């Protein structure tokens, strides 16, 4: 189920590269993170600018804490609290409007998958979030197919036994239009969704409990606002890259730029929380 910051959940490990050059940098990072609710353990390695955090907070919130010290931070990898790499993936979400975000998938154990991320540009309120069958964005989000449903079940809520495997329930957007969420799911597996797509919808998912004809099909959550292909991503200590081999940008230069396209060559803009 989706949880807000400080609501607990299963611990995971987040690996960041942080711009640190001296012991005072290390001290500032320790002081900021160790006083934060939801952070259990912090390891800082100045020599390779690495910060390893054991936490129940979404990665975006940990990154914001790190950058509140005045230092840039980039998430490099995720893993279970036992520092095991059981599978990780990421979806970069975009649509025809202003909605955009990044959502990450992490297999915490063979029985539990973590889905966490931040989506901006939403109307305040609840929005349905689902894994869809196809990773096909040729017609924007309309070509992603139906909800991922290999069991042939009816649409339901994330806590239901009888549900589409891609049914992740709702995420809540604040007045700013931002939804930051952390979902733990017992049916979804990272290795089953790589190459598929993640879609956020215009309205609230009724979890199959409404009286609308689409309740048991889509949750009657309205049109698809933004989507992204779910791609394999780095686990802990699997991403040593400091410079992109494709265009020579450092991890600091490419921060806040698109992964590809003309905008990647433009001067860096303040990151849209991604």
Curated annotation (Swiss-Prot):
Region (Superoxide dismutase-like): 88-234
Keywords tagged on the record: Chaperone, Copper, Cytoplasm, Disulfide bond, Isopeptide bond, Metal-binding, Phosphoprotein, Ubl conjugation, Zinc
Residues that, per the record, bind Cu cation 2: 244, 246
Domain (HMA) ranges: 11-74
Gene3D superfamilies the record matches: 3.30.70.100, Superoxide dismutase, copper/zinc binding domain (2.60.40.200)
PROSITE patterns membership: HMA_2 (PS50846), SOD_CU_ZN_2 (PS00332)
Cofactor note: Binds 2 copper ions per subunit.
Pfam families linked to this entry: HMA, Sod_Cu
Cross-link type Glycyl lysine isopeptide (Lys-Gly) (interchain with G-Cter in ubiquitin), residue numbers: 76, 189, 216, 241
Modification after translation (UniProt): Ubiquitinion by XIAP/BIRC4 leads to enhancement of its chaperone activity toward its physiologic target, SOD1, rather than proteasomal degradation. XIAP/BIRC4 preferentially ubiquitinates at Lys-241.
Modified residues (Phosphoserine): 267
Co-factor(s): Cu(2+); Zn(2+)
Gene Ontology biological process terms in this record: removal of superoxide radicals
GO CC terms, sorted: cytoplasm; nucleus
Family recorded in the similarity comment: In the C-terminal section; belongs to the Cu-Zn superoxide dismutase family.
Summary of the function given for this chain in its UniProt record: Delivers copper to copper zinc superoxide dismutase (SOD1).
Subunit architecture: Homodimer, and heterodimer with SOD1. Interacts with COMMD1. Interacts with XIAP/BIRC4. Interacts with SLC31A1(via C-terminal domain); this interaction is Cu(1+)-mediated. The heterodimer CCS:SOD1 interacts with SLC31A1; this heterotrimer is Cu(1+)-mediated and its maintenance is regulated through SOD1 activation.
Name recorded for this polypeptide: Copper chaperone for superoxide dismutase
Organism: Rattus norvegicus (Rat)
């Amino acid at each position: 189920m989706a949880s807000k910051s400080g609501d607990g959940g299963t611990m995971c490990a987040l690996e960041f590269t942080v711009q640190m050059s001296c012991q005072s940098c290390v001290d500032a990072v320790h002081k900021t993170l160790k006083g934060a609710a939801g952070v259990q353990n912090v390891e800082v390695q100045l020599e390779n600018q690495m910060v390893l955090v054991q936490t129940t907070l979404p990665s975006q919130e940990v990154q914001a804490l790190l950058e509140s010290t005045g230092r840039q931070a980039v998430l490099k990898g995720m893993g279970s609290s036992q520092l095991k790499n059981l599978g990780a993936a990421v979806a970069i979400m975009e649509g025809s409007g202003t909605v955009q975000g990044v959502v990450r998938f992490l297999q915490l154990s063979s029985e539990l998958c973590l889905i966490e991320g931040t989506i901006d540009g939403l109307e305040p309120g609840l929005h349905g979030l689902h894994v869809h069958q196809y990773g096909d964005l040729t017609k924007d989000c309309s070509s992603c197919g139906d909800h991922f449903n290999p069991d042939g079940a009816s649409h339901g809520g994330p806590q239901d036994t009888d549900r589409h495997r891609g049914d992740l329930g709702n995420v809540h957007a604040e007045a700013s239009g931002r939804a930051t969420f952390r979902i733990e799911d017992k049916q979804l597996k990272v290795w089953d969704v790589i190459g598929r797509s993640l879609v956020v919808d215009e309205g609230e998912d009724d979890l199959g409990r409404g009286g609308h004809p689409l309740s048991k099909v889509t949750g009657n959550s309205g049109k698809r606002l933004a989507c992204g292909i779910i791609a394999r991503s780095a686990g802990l200590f699997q991403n040593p890259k400091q410079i992109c081999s494709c265009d020579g940008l450092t991890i600091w230069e490419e921060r806040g730029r698109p992964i590809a396209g003309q905008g990647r060559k433009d001067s860096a803009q303040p990151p849209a929380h991604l």
